[in-house]
Design a protein with these regions (language model features):
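Short, exposed beta-strand/loop patches in secreted or surface proteins that constitute
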Residues: 6-11
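A short, structured surface patch at a secondary-structure boundary
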Residues: 14-20, 24-112, 118-125
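Ligand-binding pocket segment of bilobal, Venus flytrap-like solute-binding proteins
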Residues: 16-19, 231, 239-252
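Stable alpha-helical elements in mature extracytoplasmic
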Residues: 49, 56-63, 69, 107, ...
Length: 252
């Protein structure tokens, strides 16, 4: 296992208990299976099929594409023009996925009208806890994914398995993940080239945004045989993936 931010325990009858630290526990119940009595109050029941999902966390979309599960997503928290995933942009342009507002301002009326079975958010929603509370009040379970808290690229990719569980595509998820790990293996075995690389963007007020040293992008540079040039940058918190630098510091 590469991941550390979720665990999954399988039980007889196809039931699966998912535990996401600081985000909750979820019992996935197979379609047609009996309800489970006397569950702890903190456990959220997710009954399959989960086929009308409101997807807010953009990093999850590519994993759904790899699981051939775009048809499970009914609503998006990103507009069509905002998607970097071509399949998602096309699905929205064709009307197969509708825009239902960003994480801080969801269109509750549209979400309810679509019969939403699950909202997948990232930790940004924790800055607007009333949104999560309102969705749950309307009967829409909310799963806050924490893949951004994982320690490396393969750990983030392993969240594919969690969505495989939710979508009843466990075998496909396991196989896709295995293939991806095999593809990366030869790269990990090569010697470091010693070549340095930077990964950055420039803000409108002329600050340089760079990835901190332990961020997954910086790790990918190392995995590919390079040396991330900012080898001593850390954020104020473990969840902070970027740091802003003045131009003078960046070029120093």
């Amino acid at each position: 296992l590469f991941r550390s931010q979720f665990s999954a325990d399988c039980y007889e009858g196809g039931y699966v208990m998912i535990d996401i630290p600081d985000a909750g526990r979820f019992l996935v119940v197979p379609e047609g299976a009996a309800e489970v009595d006397d569950l702890p109050e903190d456990v959220v029941v997710l009954r399959q099929p989960l086929d009308h999902i409101y997807l807010v966390s953009t990093s999850v979309m590519d994993l759904f594409v790899h699981l051939d599960a775009l048809d499970s997503i009914a609503l998006s928290g990103t507009k069509a023009e905002g998607w970097y995933v071509e399949e998602a942009r096309q699905a929205m342009q064709e009307g197969r996925i509708a825009y239902a507002g960003k994480y801080s301002a969801p269109d509750y009326e549209r979400i309810l009208a679509a019969g939403c079975t699950l909202a997948i958010e990232n930790t940004m929603v924790l800055h607007d806890p009333e949104v999560k509370e309102q969705l749950e009040k309307f009967g829409v379970p909310v799963l806050v994914e924490r893949s951004s808290y994982e320690s490396g690229p393969l750990a983030r990719m392993e969240w594919l398995k969690l969505y495989g569980i939710l979508l009843n595509k466990t075998e496909m998820a396991e196989e896709v993940f295995r293939q991806k790990v095999e593809q990366v293996a030869p790269i990990l075995e090569q010697e470091n080239t010693g070549k340095t690389a930077a990964f950055f963007s420039i803000t409108t007020n002329n600050l340089i945004t760079v990835r901190r040293t332990s961020d997954y992008v910086a790790q990918m540079v190392g995995m590919a045989g390079g040396v991330y040039i900012f080898d001593d940058l850390e954020g104020e918190t473990s969840a902070q993936s970027t740091i802003k630098l003045p131009l003078e510091t960046f070029y120093a």
